[in-house]
Amino acid sequence: MNNNTEKPSLLDRLRPNLIWIIFATLGWYMFIAAFGHFAWEGMMDAIKDHISPAMFFTLDMYAATIVDVITLFILCWFFKKNRYIWKSFMIKPASSGYAAGDILTEDDAYADLYGRRRNSFKMLGIGLLLGFLTNFFCIICALLHGDIKLYFDCAASQIPYFLFSLVCVCIQSSSEEMWCRGFMYERLHERYPLWVAVVVNGVLFGLLHIFNPGVSAIPIIGIIITGLSYSLLRWYCGNIWIAMGIHTGWNFTQNFLFGLPNSGLVSEASVFHLDAANAVSSIIYDWEFGVEGGIPALFIDALLGAIILYMAIKDGKIRELGMNRLQTLEAHGLKMRVEEAEPVAEAAPAEVVEEVHEDAAEKAEDVDSTTAE
């Protein structure tokens, strides 16, 4: 008896593995993005003497991450299987919805359920407000504890610069969210229960900051908790824009509004300025790493995650943490088909099968009549 079944290659056997997903993603990012950042640094060296130090900082530390967004775009569109991830970053107008009875591809169904149908500027705004409030809470704690002193020094002529900086910070924060709470999160959720995507995502997010200036154990633990909380927020709210917003609001508030270190990096210009000579470290504030090196930041992010879990338990959504992508879609009662096609109304599967059987029967009758003759 001939067995034509081919054994899966070593590459095929590795692909479902958690380690493969992680290292393949990081490898692609480092290989492709490295060329882009090399070119960006060359451009920055060429214009360094023609722009202010503040503008150089904004372009070099924040706007440069546009390279990471482009790298992710290439990854999502070069490999067709990843395109649904990029779709989940977009906004889908209400007028482009599907008709009743449509059967979607699994990718389109997921992109709609957790992405483009729920992404909105409203969610981005809510995220920005959350980012400001959570960071402001940590700054107030540091001020009341006497760890820092701030003074106001901002001219009206600087407002355009700060608005431009907000856009650049949004690019930087969104690029991290798109890679972590977007690509990595989605690829893990495709094969594993959601809790695996949340946990791995949070840990990797923390490890990505281990080379930041002034880093220590508490900031890394805090950033891991931040990654966990932002992953839960992205899941519970059903869109990534709110995560982009809270990340942007946090970074912009501490770096450009209050002039504090953002993960160890200090802006050249801000609305308020830190009296660095009198800043001290404590359990509330780290003079090198900023409020992210204190207990309040760890507490506020843990509280955010706890609130999300409480709300998920209360409305019964918590069960999704134990489901992979396909199981989640089935739990929501979405009809799916495997092949790619335009999202238009189709005949029911049973009718399609019946038509196929009728065609086969007609062909069989033609063959029988020909044989008889």
PLM features: residue spans?
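Membrane-helix interface linkers and caps
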Residues: 2-11, 32-126, 132, 141-153, ...
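Membrane-embedded alpha-helical segments of multi-pass membrane proteins
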Residues: 62-71, 159-166, 179, 220-228, ...
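Small-polar-interrupted transmembrane alpha-helices in polytopic inner-membrane proteins
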Residues: 135-136, 169, 193-210, 223-224
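C-terminal membrane module of polytopic membrane proteins
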Residues: 253-373
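Hydrophobic core of alpha-helical transmembrane segments in multi-pass integral membrane proteins
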Residues: 25-33, 68-77, 131-139, 298-313
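Membrane-interface helix/loop boundary segments of multi-pass membrane proteins
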Residues: 175-200, 232-239
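Functionally important transmembrane alpha-helices
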Residues: 30-41, 219-283
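Membrane-interface helix caps and helix-loop-helix hairpins in membrane proteins
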Residues: 147-152, 209-217
